[in-house]
Amino acid sequence: MVRMTKQCTAFDELPRADLLRVALETMHVGHLLDRALMPQLFFATESFDAVDQVAIDEWMGASPVYTGRMRRLMKIEGDTVPAIVKALQLDCGFPHQYMDVGWTMIDDASCEFYLRHCGALLDVEPYGAERVHGMCVTIEDPTFDATAYATNPRARIRPLHRPPRVPADRLPHCHWTIRIDPANDPVGPAKNTQAVASLPLARIVNERATERDDGWTGYARDVVPEFKLGMLSSATLAAVAREFQMQEHLLSASAEMALVERVGLEKARAVLLQQWGALGWRASERLAATLGLANGGADAVARVLRLHAILPPGFSRDVRVQGESVTLRLEPQNAELLDAEHPGWLGLAARGEGLGIETAAQGVDPRARLEAIAVRAGGIEAEISVRASAEAAKIPKSATFMKDSTATKFVFDTSAARLGS
């Protein structure tokens, strides 16, 4: 086992108010990542069917693996509907507020949930009913059951109503049931689930810092329908934020596996690299705004890099500032993590690709430049300059396609009532 002990201590060091906002942002990356990926995939294939199928395989491959991880971290036991609900409340596919989910608990074998606001729906509705059907029917049907599979293979998630919306302003946006019937044939693992589960990344152990008495240390209690991240203790919330990063890296690995099947290894990695670059910039913009770092500079770049979701779990992050220079060192907790053939963003970093690191810096301060990157037995080292005299870099073309997404523009309500603090 690889122990995830040092690489994200920046979460544990944040003031609680900042930690809550950063954890929300980290969860939200689960929706930003497909806003970065799918345009690049469409340009590579000119096929919406390919987009739908890669999305299906991406989420089906990764979600059972990361659901199991979150269940262990949060002490979620059992194979009931409430256990499924708790895991969904901690799934980056259901980021809080952006996907404003209401829950009606019935018993251990059934519940209903509905979306008062679905940012993903509002993203695709301008493109017409066919794209809405692709997301809300073609993709949702298999991926929902795959997520529930991690808790109970006989669970089924089925719609009471869902988009395309009739009438066009129908609320809630959709309404679903979760039911467990012993007579159901068990759902089996998706074709890539075992491959994702066997990755070195998936085997990292997420250890918490010393607990303080400022919130829940797990979710072994009854379901709280209006669960919020602010109900968790600081150490638990920091661990959950690390787990959100893990979810997103496992999704990137699963996405690469799905891409390779359709476009081959070389093109798959090229598509993934563009996703990494786009996400680096956009997620940094949001983190910088959340942390009040509008003025940029080397210290601001360093602060965001310590927290950014595109950098791999399982690595210690040593970020140092000297004048207008930032040095980022990523040291793997186990040598098997530094694998150039590892699928996903981890493999990009392990091969010495620097695009995501550079754009993550530029999303904080467009004057930032990646001056050098090196991969050695001890890890990855990047040198970044943030010179006051430098010209502002242009936003990557891959990131421009995210500009109008509701996920990119979404602003969280950080009032105490909405955060649960």
List the model feature ranges, each with a label.
Residues 1-112, 119-145, 149-175, 181-421:
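N-terminal accessory segment detector
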